[in-house]
Structure formats: structure tokens, C-alpha cells
Amino acid sequence: LIDHLVGTYENPPRSTVAQAYDFIIETLEEAVTLMSEEKNNGRMNKYAARALLARIYLYHDDNRKAFDLADQLIKDADTSESYALYPHEKYVAAWSVEAKFGSESFFEIANSVDDTPGRDSWGYLLNWYGYQKGFVTQKYAEQMLADPGDVRGQLLEENKYAGKTVWWLYKLRGTDLKTAPLECNNVVLRLSEVYLIAAEAGCKLGGDAAVQGLGYLNEIVKRGNPDNEVTMADYTLDRVLDERSKELVGEGHRFFDLLRNGKTIVRKGGYHLPSVDEEVDWDFYKCVLPIPEDQFIFSPEMEQNPGYPKN
């Protein structure tokens, strides 16, 4: 952990995962007391800090704190003039480049055509004009297309790639849908995720928290398709994770959702992969990246992550 200006010859030791979590939580808890509630596009505020802290609590398996913070944040957003869930009828439009910093947005990284990194931009990677492999998995496409009433399916666009029918994800759109979306913002924290944090934490806690958590889950489910609803009998961790995959697709959560809940990662053959299904256990050593070799020049006593050679 680096919490001060490091000198030229200073070589801080490696911290534990627990120490890292403690430091992050302590920093965010302090930030919440210092930051303004005013929405300032492209910058963090108190709402954004609380949303990130709720996510950290959930990752840390502190479900009571995750639920209580998410629950209060939802209530505060509901009474604010700045934040609200995107309604069903405006959901697709909310992802257009013209709708940056929408009512759900707590924090997003601002991009413009003047500062775009070009081929290194997120939009380029996900666009048919770019690397041409930014389409969703076959499993996800089939799941969304099976429910034509779910408005989130309208973010998928049918296309052809290598002679196959594939489905592009249009959460990151260009200004005209003909060129790579280089000026799309990167959404980091939004209100829908906070609803799903409360839903997951409530499911794990049970009792009154589960009753409230189910209500928050159904806010997201019914916003997608007003005819759908999850009953208490179907309110399970897997159902919550399934809804997270639908709502947060393309936002970088699914892999970590599975790991932190001890789930097996199942990679089904389809558009991207061979026809053979592949399963990866959550504790497989490659789920954690190796420490770069150059680091050992400065810290020769540091241990490499399990499973990887040190040189």
C-alpha cells in the first residue's frame, strides 16, 4: 500500500488482501464525510463514493453494511433532484452518446473526440468498425432474445461476422452508428447497480432485508419487462446474479461476480469459442494475474503469485 510520497530508494513491502480492503474501506468511509452531494459531471461526489463503498462492502462479504448503505443510497437518490432509474420507455436512448451523464449516472469517465485514444478506446474495442469481435456471447444473446418484452434486448443489434449471425452490444454508441464510438463515456457507477447490490446482500441476509431486497430486484426486473416479476420462492443468489448479467452486461462485472461468490465459470462454445464447453473453478490460479517480472528487480524478496514461476 502506498499512502505517502515514496522516496527514490524506498521499497514498500507487499500488503495482504485484507490490508488492501481495510485501506480502501477506511479511505472511502472518510471520503463520504468530506465530499459534496452536488452532481459534477465527470467527477466523484458523495453519491458516487457511497456507491463504490457499497460495492466494496459486497465484495468484502460484509452484507449487512452493503445492504444498509445501498438501501439508504437508493432512498436518498429517490428524494434528490439529480438521480433516478432510467424508465422503461427511455432505457435504450439513455445509452446514446447524446445522453451522457444521465439520471442514473453517479460517475462515468468523460471522453470526447478531442481526447479519444483512438484504437485504444473502449468503444473501438466493442464496435463492428473496430476489432469486429465486440459481440455478446451466444448464451447471452439467446437469453435476451427469448424475452422480446425486455427492453434491454433492444441494445443488441444483429450483424454478420465471418458468415455467422452475431449480436453487437450497443451500450457504447458512436454519434451516427456508422463510425467507431470513440467519444462514448465509460460508465463506472450507476444507480441500477446499487439496486442490485441491495438485492444480493438482502438475499444473503434473509429476513426483513430479503423482503426489501426482493423489492429492489423487481424494480430492475420490471423496468426491463413490466410483465416480469420474481417471487420470493425464486429469489436466490443465482437469480440475482442472472439479473446482474442482464443489466450490467458490458460494464465489467460478470467475471468478478462469479469469482467472489465461489461460482464455476462456464464458457460455452459459440461465436467466440470452440464448440467444446470449458469450466474454470473460481480458485483456478490463472484467475489472478502474475506479478510482472520487472517488479522483482526492485523487490527480489517478493513472492510470485501461486502457480506462476518467478523468472
Residue ranges with predicted function:
Residues W128-E142:
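Short, cationic low-complexity segments
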